[in-house]
Amino acid sequence: MEHVNEILATVGVILQQTQTTQDVNASAKLGAYIGAGVTMIAGSTVGIGQGYIFGKAVEAIARNPEVEKQVFKLIFIGSAVSESTAIYGLLISFILIFVAGA
């Protein structure tokens, strides 16, 4: 009977350690998914900023049509630079979901 109790105690300890490991893995996945969601804020803020910038560019061209080429050149360069922030955020969220969350 003592051997049965020892075996049951050993199995209980193993199951408890397995459960703790599963909890840690679940917490790591949860943290990765929350981090991925937070990084996507970068994409939304870039969209808001680009909308504001393009609106102001249209206003500038409406006031002074002669500067259309200059404004569009600056707008496209600025748009590409600001879009890189959203792309980096998307890349980080993919890494968090598919690498850290796996």
Curated annotation (Swiss-Prot):
GO biological process per UniProt: proton motive force-driven ATP synthesis
PROSITE patterns, per the entry: ATPASE_C
UniProt site positions, description: Reversibly protonated during proton transport: 83
Entry keyword Cell membrane: yes
Membrane-spanning segments: 34-54, 80-100
UniProt GO MF annotations: lipid binding; proton-transporting ATP synthase activity, rotational mechanism
Record flagged with keyword Cell membrane: yes
Keywords: ATP synthesis, Cell membrane, CF(0), Hydrogen ion transport, Ion transport, Lipid-binding, Membrane, Transmembrane, Transmembrane helix, Transport
Membrane topology term: Multi-pass membrane protein
Subcellular location: Cell membrane
Signal peptide: none
GO CC terms, sorted: plasma membrane; proton-transporting ATP synthase complex; proton-transporting two-sector ATPase complex, proton-transporting domain
First-listed, main subcellular location of the protein, grouped into a coarse class: membrane
Any Pfam family hit: ATP-synt_C
Additional note from the record: Dicyclohexylcarbodiimide (DCDD) binding to the active glutamate residue inhibits ATPase in vitro.
Function: F(1)F(0) ATP synthase produces ATP from ADP in the presence of a proton or sodium gradient. F-type ATPases consist of two structural domains, F(1) containing the extramembraneous catalytic core and F(0) containing the membrane proton channel, linked together by a central stalk and a peripheral stalk. During catalysis, ATP synthesis in the catalytic domain of F(1) is coupled via a rotary mechanism of the central stalk subunits to proton translocation.
Subunit and interaction comment: F-type ATPases have 2 components, F(1) - the catalytic core - and F(0) - the membrane proton channel. F(1) has five subunits: alpha(3), beta(3), gamma(1), delta(1), epsilon(1). F(0) has three main subunits: a(1), b(2) and c(10-14). The alpha and beta chains form an alternating ring which encloses part of the gamma chain. F(1) is attached to F(0) by a central stalk formed by the gamma and epsilon chains, while a peripheral stalk is formed by the delta and b chains.
Protein family membership: Belongs to the ATPase C chain family.
Protein's name in the database: ATP synthase subunit c
Organism: Mycoplasma genitalium (strain ATCC 33530 / DSM 19775 / NCTC 10195 / G37)
Gene that produces this protein: atpE
